[in-house]
Amino acid sequence: MSRALEPAEPILSAEGTPYSPRYDDVYHSTEGGLAQAHYVFLGGNGLPQAWAGRDQFVIVETGFGQGLNFLATWQAWRNDPQRCRRLHFVSIEKHPFTREGLAQLHAGLADMLPLAQQLQAAWPDALPGLHRLAFEDGGVTLTLALGDIEAVLPKLVAGADAFYLDGFSPSRNADMWSPLVFRGLARLARPGATLATYTAAGFVRRGLREAGFDARKAPGFGGKRDMTVATFCPVWKSRRHAPTPAPEWKVRHAIVIGAGLAGCAVTERLASRGWQVTLFDVHDGPARQTSSHRAAAMHAHISSDDSLLSRLSRAGNQYALRAWAALAGAGQPVGWHGCGVLQIGENEAEAEAQRAALEALGLPESFVRWMSPGEAASQHGAGVPRGGLWFPQGGWVAPPDICSAQLRRAGDAVQSRFGTRVERIRRRDDEWEAIDEDGAVLASAPILVLANAHEAPRLAPMRHQVMRRVRGQLTTLAPGQVTALGSWPDCVVTGAGYLLPVSEDGSARVGSSYEADDGPLVARTEVHAANLDRLAGLLPQAAAAAGNLDAAAMSGYVGVRTVSHNRLPLIGQMPDEAAAIAAAPSLRGAHLRDIPRVPGLYAALAYASRGLTWAALGAELLASQIEGDPLPLEADLVDAIDPARLLLRALRHGQVGREEGHSSGLSG
């Protein structure tokens, strides 16, 4: 389970240097934090010269502190005409400052204050896990890994070109300087990666050497005689999967099939990295199927053990909010209504379980807290039968508005081919071809992304990616019906069903069914009646009035969700099932990174009821995988949504054989 984070306090020493009473040490030399950053970390890694002319450069730091190393590196990047196209800065921090604490410590930064204020504005809540923050229109990306280094470092997926080791003194914080950490850094190091640190402790150099670094002394900063610099050049091969250089794409062009939440998000993320995208959808515009409904809610999942779903949904919610804010900042608002979400238990036992989970997790109240029935009624007009989890950052939005904003943001980088059906796809000469029913090639590109939900198995072999169709029906209450029900909440309320606040036209929505897709997508009276029962359970004072409404006269929305075997999405590079089956005996003890993959073919599928949660983060994950960037999720979370996960399980259990592995069906 993820541990609750304990934020650092902005305390100064007698000399005016930021100080940690927890470690009884200062955050940087009394000679000055920025001067130390330039001398030790940039200079010790040969920056900015080392990134000159590069497409991508990745720095991994241990100990973010007040962020001076990041700010100094960002400023150096801005000032360098030979800078790399994209700078990635990945930093681990166990005790992050709050936004207010950073502002206090940054107050005297003078000409760097504008950058510091951008960092403060983007600063996340103290939630364990990875937080990706983008600056300079994506040219500079900060990925904060919040948590204990011994837990976080093994889960990072990145290829590092340089390391900043900036933990507190080894004598005060030994966990940051252990052999486990040094081996973890070596796992991430690209060939020739450099390293610098303020410390000159002999055991640090010895530990780095044992991990494959050529570590040596260098003249220290200020009054310190020595520091340590290193280069990764192991004399033996000990890594099963070594980081590789970022791919050098001759042509940045991708085909995306499906223009719902998944496909539009992928299109925008690829366009932000300089890709041209040809977007296909059989309908006459974006968000015409499952993503077409005019109101969808989003909040995180909470569990006492901080399960994979809980961690994924937390990451997805946080990234989505940042992504939508960035769209709004670029003049493309998505219409997000951050009214908050109240999630109540279906009964008192479930409510007690919610409270116990909340207490066990220790998450900040800015993310989730307990709300009593009295507070829900007085503050939000929600006459709920019991207390529940209050998500102040939750809310609702119209998915089509997100899709439209993303495509507008992509601009000329996207060629939308609406009303066009891709009949099949084919791999030829290192490119993917989208082909119509007459056999004509509609487009070709080195990358193809399947974002077309339950239609995907029609285009690619997916024997081991189990998906099913689940019907969902929302009920729309007309303005007069809402008035007849009495007080209506100004927030989203969820439990055994959900209801949304009143829309601008005075209507409100209640949902939703979750049933097998067994017929035409038309509204059913009995489902409207069931939704009214759900409403009565959420707002007991409205039960009598709801019982008087005529379900047969109701209108609403009907759609189909695409759901995986465990309700987690399928996001990542597609497995080559034929190759894996042919090599089945050798893959009995395999890991996901051992599974053969189809070159250039990716999936963004099975978002089920959490399209708002998965779409933006899933798109950033895919774009990062394609570009060879550090991933925005921990390795175990990436594995949890990998399209090859069921194939891996079948291989491990000996449940596949050569008789399955004929043609992949993707060439010819």
Curated annotation (Swiss-Prot):
Function: Catalyzes the last two steps in the biosynthesis of 5-methylaminomethyl-2-thiouridine (mnm(5)s(2)U) at the wobble position (U34) in tRNA. Catalyzes the FAD-dependent demodification of cmnm(5)s(2)U34 to nm(5)s(2)U34, followed by the transfer of a methyl group from S-adenosyl-L-methionine to nm(5)s(2)U34, to form mnm(5)s(2)U34.
SUPFAM superfamilies: FAD/NAD(P)-binding domain
Location of the protein in the cell: Cytoplasm
Keywords recorded for this protein, A-Z: Cytoplasm, FAD, Flavoprotein, Methyltransferase, Multifunctional enzyme, Oxidoreductase, S-adenosyl-L-methionine, Transferase, tRNA processing
InterPro entries linked: FAD-dep_OxRdtase, FAD/NAD-bd_sf, MnmC-like_methylTransf, SAM-dependent_MTases_sf, tRNA_MAMT_biosynth_bifunc_MnmC, tRNA_MNMC2, tRNA_S-uridine_synth_MnmC_C
GO molecular function, one term: tRNA (5-methylaminomethyl-2-thiouridylate)(34)-methyltransferase activity
Superkingdom field: Bacteria
Cytoplasm listed as a keyword: yes
Source organism (scientific name): Cupriavidus pinatubonensis (strain JMP 134 / LMG 1197) (Cupriavidus necator (strain JMP 134))
A GO cellular-component term linked to this record: cytoplasm
Gene: mnmC
Catalyses which reaction(s): 5-aminomethyl-2-thiouridine(34) in tRNA + S-adenosyl-L-methionine = 5-methylaminomethyl-2-thiouridine(34) in tRNA + S-adenosyl-L-homocysteine + H(+)
Pfam families: DAO, Methyltransf_30
Entry keyword S-adenosyl-L-methionine: yes
Name this polypeptide is given: tRNA 5-methylaminomethyl-2-thiouridine biosynthesis bifunctional protein MnmC
GO biological process: methylation; tRNA wobble base modification
Cofactor: FAD
